[in-house]
Amino acid sequence: MRLTKLAALSIVLTAAPVVAAPQPPVTIAAAVASPARRPDNVKLDEGRKPAAVLKFLGLRPGMNVLDLFGANAYWAEIEAPVVGPKGHVTVWQPTQFYRDKTKQSFGEFAAKHPNVSIVTSPFEAPALPKNYADFVILNDNYHDTYWQNEKYGIPKMDPNAFLKAIYAAMKPGAVIGVIDHVALPNDDVRATVEKFHRIDPEVVKADFKRAGFVLAGSSDMLRNPADPHSTDPFDESIKGKTDRFVFKFRKPR
């Protein structure tokens, strides 16, 4: 009888879902070097310099992170071990870009990281947690707030409204890192974005200032003077090597 009970218990335990135990925080360098990262993400490191970027922006253990457009888990798989069990990473993904394949891959990733979750909403109506984030990252996507596309169901949007939602999601004193492809100065921002998927850094500075943010720093670590700025970032001649700015904005205390 005892053996029967033990066998039954073994079956129950085997069938129970395995939840990853919380792990103590690690350094940014250790998180970047982790063999647990997806190989397709690791391939992007040379062009993105994640360790240098996150160090510059100030990611630390215990932070609440808002990772915008982050369902590919490129940044989240580094952020999660760095913030550790006392921090949390919330990924926001537009519903227009959260299809079955992405849902599956992110679900598998989140199952291994108890301090990671995801929220989704339409691109044009970002539903973000209020007064939540100590740290926000927006990588290569701010220009898309000036983009519209019928194929993907993206209407013409108001960048100011998008930034207002981000501002409300951040705690006083929180930082947001903004990385994007550099465009040459042009009076028609939307036309430039439509053609090149790039944005003038001065437009970004002005937009964030108008939204109430303070520029706390900038870095040239991803600049590339050899970029002709005349192709979109998906062109094989420049893919992964575009001229990019890195801005660090802060929400005033």
What are these model-derived regions, one by one?
Residues 63, 126-140:
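A short acidic, Gly/Pro-enriched loop at the edge of an enzyme's catalytic core
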Residues 101-127:
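S-adenosyl-L-methionine
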Residues 62-71:
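Conserved class I S-adenosyl-L-methionine
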Residues 211, 226-253:
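Core SAM-dependent methyltransferase catalytic element
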